[in-house]
């Protein structure tokens, strides 16, 4: 039987590229998204790409009933699920004193609790099956410490902690868990950006556009990592290098290395 895959935020960006890769392999692919027109168009693309069953179910990951509805539908129609990819997410930036509590609540509800909801409703299905794979899309921002992005960093760090916790918790049930931490790459994350600093938003857009890997390339690295059963999937070598430095170097040395990296990311006019 073909693999059964559900991807949140699957109508565009990284989620769409992941869906297309699985579709080309003949999988049964369901995408959930809040954008219905995009979702329907991507569903058509998945069918043309070779999915044995391509579906779009409107799904807002901040609404418990939406996520539960997807789980119930796929359990009934497909008899379960093999791969859950919690991909839906948004971006936020700004100095700690400038970002409102409402913006903190907004990003936490989507980036963290949206992932929690997916894990919560699909884990019982995986336990009944005795197998399954949860793939949570975090970010290198969850492993490193990018200034003026505290709300985003916190949600992604929490997704990393959730994932590694569940990897240990669910192992005895035959359930695998992977967490993906990409750096900047060419995607549409800027569409969701809430920022108190227009200059920072502009810089982020440039960094995303100048990423060395495309969304399709990142997606392929993820699919390969899932197939290999990796827990941490780090698509960018530069990000992995910084993470190793943070873990193993004295903090003073790591901090100097990281600050230098941050300076290179800034526009020339904003450096020093």
PLM regions: where:
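Active-site loop immediately N-terminal to the catalytic Tyr-X3-Lys motif
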Residues: 97, 144-150, 154
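SDR active-site lid
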Residues: 172-237
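Residue(s) in the substrate-gating loop at a strand-loop-helix junction
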Residues: 139
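Canonical Rossmann dinucleotide-binding motif of NAD(H)/NADP(H)-dependent dehydrogenases/reductases
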Residues: 1-30
């Amino acid at each position: 039987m073909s693999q059964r895959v559900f991807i949140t935020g699957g109508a565009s960006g990284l989620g769409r590229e992941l869906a297309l890769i699985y579709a080309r392999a003949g999988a049964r692919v369901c995408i959930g998204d809040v954008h219905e027109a995009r979702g329907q168009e991507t569903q058509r693309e998945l069918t043309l790409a070779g999915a044995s069953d391509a579906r779009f179910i409107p799904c807002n990951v901040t609404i418990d009933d939406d996520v539960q509805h997807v789980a119930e539908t796929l359990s009934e129609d497909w008899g379960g699920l093999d791969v859950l990819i919690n991909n839906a997410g948004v971006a936020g930036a700004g100095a700690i004193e400038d970002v409102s509590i409402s913006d903190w609540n907004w990003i936490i509800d989507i980036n963290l609790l949206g992932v929690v909801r997916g894990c919560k409703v699909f884990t019982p299905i995986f336990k009944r099956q005795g197998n399954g794979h949860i793939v949570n899309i975090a970010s290198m921002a969850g492993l490193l410490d990018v200034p003026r992005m505290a709300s985003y960093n916190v949600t992604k760090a929490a997704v990393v902690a959730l994932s590694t916790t569940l990897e240990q918790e669910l192992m005895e049930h035959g359930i695998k868990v992977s967490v993906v931490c990409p750096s900047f790459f060419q995607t549409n994350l800027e569409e969701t950006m809430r920022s108190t600093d227009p200059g920072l938003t502009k810089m982020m857009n440039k960094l995303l556009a100048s990423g060395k890997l495309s969304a399709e390339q990142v997606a392929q690295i993820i699919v390969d990592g899932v197939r290999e059963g990796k827990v941490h999937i780090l698509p960018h070598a530069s990000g992995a290098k910084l993470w190793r430095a943070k873990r193993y170097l004295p903090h003073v040395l790591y901090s100097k290395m990281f600050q230098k990296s941050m300076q290179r990311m800034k526009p020339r006019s904003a450096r020093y």
